[in-house]
Amino acid sequence: MMLTIDIDTARRFILGKQGLWPGRRWRGMEGTEQAMRAMEYLQLDPLQIIARSHDIALHSRVLDYTPGMWEDVTYRQRTFFDWGGWLAARPMDELPHWRVVMRRERESNSRMRSIARDHADTIAEMRAILRERGTVSNRDFAMATRTRTQSYRGRKDSALALYYLWLTGKVMTHHRERFERVYALTETVAPAHLIR
């Protein structure tokens, strides 16, 4: 038997599922986490014209939301992690499922295999530096000391190596500075039971 609903009910259901109806119902830091969980996938926007789109999306759902609250629940509380070509914050407890996709990027993505082959020494160097320092940003490496690349992902071999390690799940975003990723080895960011 097919269930029939009217358009208003369907609209309210869809808006309610995304946290947009009936109005902003969450509040503060806890509400930010609840809204992000309801959205399931918060696309992060590096561009800021008036405000970053992820802050606008959360402001429309969370009372008392201020820009950057998503960073607290993502990077300080480690409730979410960011990842992917369409950069998004995802619930940390979903990491085991995403690690399958990360492994697929490493094994099946021809661009990633090409980066791994062409920049193997730099990738190994970045992993060693991360083991030594704990965290690292691409800005930590001056252009004068790096090999220039022709990739839209970065002008330096260090940028390409860090991007490769991040997309294939070997490193994660530890935190951000002026929206730029500061990387750390995955085992120092994610709870151990999620990366076995």
Task: Locate each region found by the language model.
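Long, low-complexity intrinsically disordered regions
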Residues: 1-196
